[in-house]
């Protein structure tokens, strides 16, 4: 089972709010997911994100692939650098 770390949309019309989730890549964007690892609110200025670092690093270690947008969020949070340094 190939897993992705991606954004699942929530919130009202014209006011998106996203959950950062780990899901099977075959599932729908807002469908079934394995685990919720954080949130992302682009409506705030600057955009606010909260990630559970331990869970995120665990799933990256298991081979979950982040989408491009989630990878940028992980870089801003400093989690991506920690993951890359563990690999080296």
Curated annotation (Swiss-Prot):
Q: Which GO terms describe its cellular component?
A: cytoplasm; small ribosomal subunit
Record keywords, A-Z:
Ribonucleoprotein, Ribosomal protein
Signal peptide: which range, if any?
none
User: Can you provide one Gene Ontology molecular function annotated for this UniProt record?
Assistant: structural constituent of ribosome
Single Gene Ontology BP annotation: translation
Q: Which SUPFAM superfamilies match?
A: Ribosomal protein S16
Q: Which family does it belong to?
A: Belongs to the bacterial ribosomal protein bS16 family.
Q: What protein does this entry describe?
A: Small ribosomal subunit protein bS16
């Amino acid at each position: 089972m190939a897993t992705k770390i991606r954004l699942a949309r929530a919130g009202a019309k014209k006011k998106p709010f996203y959950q950062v989730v780990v899901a099977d890549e075959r599932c729908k964007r807002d469908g079934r997911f394995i685990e919720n690892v954080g949130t992302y609110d682009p409506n705030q200025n600057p955009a606010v994100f909260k990630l559970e670092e331990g869970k995120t690093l665990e799933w990256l270690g298991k081979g979950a692939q982040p989408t491009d947008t989630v990878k940028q969020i992980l870089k801003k949070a400093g989690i991506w650098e920690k993951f890359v340094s563990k690999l080296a």
